UniProtKB/Swiss-Prot annotation:
Residues 1-19 form the signal peptide. Disulfide bonds: none annotated. This is Stigma-specific STIG1-like protein 1. InterPro entries: Stig-like. Keywords: Signal. Pfam families: Stig1. The keyword Protease does not apply. The lineage of its organism: Eukaryota, Viridiplantae, Streptophyta, Embryophyta, Tracheophyta. Belongs to the STIG1 family.
């Protein structure tokens, strides 16, 4: 019975609120005496920003550095030297030690639920050397289960 009373009181409150709002809104609106339905004399054309063409000389700052022509472009990104893991893949400088689509070498894609750690595709849920994330080893004698060392 209390639920029915609550439902009726909410319905009455809602009806009163709607009635008050519509009376206030209707009193403040003004009616235009003259409305022109003629076509505008000059059409206004707005350029679409999505399809706006860029100037020929303008360069995209996110564009690749065209490392196919000059592979040495990628070495400054990785710290240089022989320890650099940056490589030119598909005309882009890629860190092959941590990229899941180019793990260890170009176009070497890791399988589903694998992650690229140090250039190798590993299951971080069960690998003792990379438990839960890259370079997080479990202690001696512990197992990695579901990305946690000594789960049980």
């Amino acid at each position: 019975m209390a639920f029915v009373k609550l439902l009726v009181s909410i319905a009455i409150t809602t009806a009163i609120t709607i009635a008050v709002i519509t009376t206030i809104t209707n009193n403040t609106t003004t009616i235009r005496e003259y409305t022109s339905f003629d076509a505008p004399s000059t059409p206004t054309i707005r350029p679409n920003r999505l399809l706006a063409q860029k100037e020929v000389g303008e360069r995209n700052p996110n564009a690749a550095d065209h490392c196919n022509r000059n592979p040495e472009i990628c070495t400054p990104y990785g710290g240089g030297g022989s320890n650099s893991t940056m490589t030119c893949c598909n005309n882009k400088c890629i860190d092959v030690s941590s990229d899941d689509n180019n793990c260890g070498a170009c176009k070497n894609k890791c399988k589903f639920s694998q992650t690229c750690c140090r250039g190798q595709c590993v299951y971080v849920a069960y690998d003792k050397r990379h438990c839960g994330q890259c370079n997080h080893p479990c202690e001696l004698g512990e197992f990695c289960v579901y990305g946690l060392c000594n789960y049980a």
